[in-house]
């Protein structure tokens, strides 16, 4: 049985504004209501929303230190200095490295890239990486998706004659590293108009700035946008403002002319080129790229994403895909073990937080397992495993509205290191400190969390009758894409529906529901629906009982044919039971 969810209707948009916009655009009032909810209130704003334009990208030189960064890169290119592009091992880091490396190798042969080993060096800039750069004669390191807290590492590099340019999007501390340039839209003294770029996005702004300064046509940057949209989707940054523009054109590039490495991933994922969405990246492409860093080496992901030869791309992609299959098997096993630990009470905490530890678990999947436990129990969750002798490392995931990073930071005196965001973080501490850490963080969470945060919420955008789901409605709804944080796929509520008798359990273990739904008030208008992990509702539906259903609308493509399907978020029984 799933955790019970609360349905919450979004506040109604201004009725007169909705009516006027509906009239001006000639669209269903439900669609104009969705637009107004998103801050799109006029015809001109709707035009900009539906027709993203690359000319609306922000001037990259508005970012603090951009002049310094461009000047130092130019100096290295002209002087023939060796440049090392350095990034994290996750999707954002490897796409960022691939983007900047792909651009710079057009300008110089004195270039290489470096991805730290997850289990040997850990996250971010490492002393080992700097030593490798020094031993191989590099004079400039460009960090991507990391480095904003690498104060000591920057000084260590400087002592060895190496300059650093930091491109990051994480929150900085009070004192910035003394690098040649620190590009981070979250700097307090940075007045860049949009601060939710991905790490790859910051790298793109550096490339864009260099191109502007030295008259490189912007059109030559378009092929890099397939990397950028993979980053935007996988790192869950908001798909608003500049990110909406970049994601729109990135998806176009990914669908029409993807690089060899991404084409290999698309094919290995069983996806159909030409119809890829943000969801396809989040659930299919991104996890495969991530598997390289989780199971083997993030360097393999960059080799894939920068491959110029299709045979090489397929070879590397096939190996990464095998790592992903291995990752999924390990993920399933550890998730089951963790669930059993919590249910049996054999865990470190199961009060207001879920904390589990097993020294044998694979470090590369503990973040995924933490997310699974949040789905199961809906509590702030930390999954620990052993990392080195005497040390444990953990991945933390939170519930909506609760700042788990703040909770972890309150225990910083017990930690060797930590980092992350509001809802996701990583941490390392001495094994001997684990009991007191669990006690303190459980106490912090108990004092800080409120009841509203302890029950998942389905935010419903609008009520909808099945009869309103016409080809025109779907055509316009599709133009709301790309979806993501800040522009989520609309969730609709349709009341008093039932299955036409064709409903069945599907999936390897029969855990999902495949339905053909009919609304009682429109009995001749049925529509296909899928409810993932909702098999527990099967008996109720099979008996012919009516339900209310919340869902988003998706298009599935198979051999060039599009099929509309409801992706069910939740179902509620109605009072009038059979």
PLM regions: where:
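Cofactor-/ligand-binding subdomain signature composed of acidic, glycine-rich
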Residues: 1-79, 230, 284-319
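N-terminal small/polar loop signature for handling phosphorylated ligands or for N-terminal nucleophile
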Residues: 64-177, 182-183, 333, 374, ...
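Short glycine-cluster motifs
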Residues: 382-398
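Functional cores that coordinate and move charged inorganic groups
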Residues: 135-138, 146, 151-294, 298-304, ...
């Amino acid at each position: 049985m799933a955790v019970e969810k609360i349905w919450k209707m979004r506040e109604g948009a201004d009725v007169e504004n909705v009516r006027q916009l509906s009239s001006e655009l000639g669209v269903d009032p439900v669609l104009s209501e969705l637009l107004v909810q998103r801050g799109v209130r006029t015809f001109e704003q709707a035009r900009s929303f539906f027709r993203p334009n690359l000319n609306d990208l922000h001037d990259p030189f508005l970012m603090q230190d951009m002049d310094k960064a461009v000047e130092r890169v130019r100096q290295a290119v002209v002087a023939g200095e060796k440049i090392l592009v350095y990034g994290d091992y996750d999707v954002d880091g490897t796409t960022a490295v691939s983007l900047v490396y792909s651009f710079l190798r057009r300008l110089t042969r004195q270039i290489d890239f470096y991805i730290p080993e997850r289990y040997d060096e850990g996250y971010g800039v490492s002393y080992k990486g700097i030593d490798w750069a020094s031993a191989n004669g590099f004079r400039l390191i460009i960090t991507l998706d990391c480095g904003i807290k690498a104060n000591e590492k920057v000084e260590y590099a400087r002592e060895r004659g190496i300059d650093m340019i930091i491109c990051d999007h994480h929150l900085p501390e009070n004192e910035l590293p003394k690098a040649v340039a620190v590009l981070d839209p979250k700097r307090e003294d940075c007045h860049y108009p949009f601060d939710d770029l991905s790490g790859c996005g910051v790298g793109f702004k550096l490339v864009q700035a260099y191109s502007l300064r030295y008259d490189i046509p912007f059109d030559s940057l378009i092929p890099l946008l397939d990397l950028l949209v993979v980053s935007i989707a996988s790192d869950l940054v908001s798909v608003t403002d500049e990110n909406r523009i970049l994601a729109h054109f990135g998806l176009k590039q990914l669908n029409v002319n993807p690089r060899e490495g991404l084409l290999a991933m698309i094919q290995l994922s069983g996806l159909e080129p030409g119809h890829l969405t943000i969801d396809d990246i989040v659930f299919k492409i991104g996890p495969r790229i991530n598997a390289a860093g989780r199971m083997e080496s993030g360097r393999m992901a960059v080799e894939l994403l920068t491959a110029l030869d299709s045979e090489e791309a397929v070879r590397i992609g096939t190996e990464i895909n095998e790592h992903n299959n291995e990752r999924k098997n390990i993920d399933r096993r550890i998730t089951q073990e963790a669930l059993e630990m919590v249910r049996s009470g054999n865990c470190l905490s199961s009060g207001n937080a879920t904390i589990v530890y097993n020294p044998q678990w694979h470090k590369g999947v503990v973040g995924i397992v933490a997310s699974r436990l949040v789905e199961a129990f809906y509590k702030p969750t930390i999954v620990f495993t052993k990392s080195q002798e005497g040390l444990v490392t953990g991945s933390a995931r939170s519930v909506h509205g609760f700042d788990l990073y703040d909770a972890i930071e309150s225990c910083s005196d017990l930690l060797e290191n930590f980092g992350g965001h509001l809802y996701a973080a990583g941490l390392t501490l001495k094994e001997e400190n684990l009991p007191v850490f669990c006690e303190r963080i459980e106490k912090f969470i108990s004092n800080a969390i409120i009841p509203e945060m302890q029950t998942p919420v389905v935010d419903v955008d609008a009520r909808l009758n099945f009869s309103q789901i016409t080809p025109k409605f779907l055509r316009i709804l599709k133009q709301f894409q790309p979806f993501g944080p800040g522009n989520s796929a609309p969730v609709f509520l349709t009341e008093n529906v039932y299955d036409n008798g064709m409903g069945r359990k599907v999936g390897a273990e029969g855990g999902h529901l495949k339905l053909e739904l009919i609304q009682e008030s429109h009995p001749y208008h049925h529509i296909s629906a899928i409810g993932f992990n909702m098999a527990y509702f099967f008996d109720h539906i099979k008996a012919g009982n009516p339900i209310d259903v919340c869902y988003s609308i998706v298009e599935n493509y198979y051999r060039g044919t599009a099929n509309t399907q409801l992706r069910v978020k939740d179902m509620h029984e109605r009072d009038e039971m059979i």
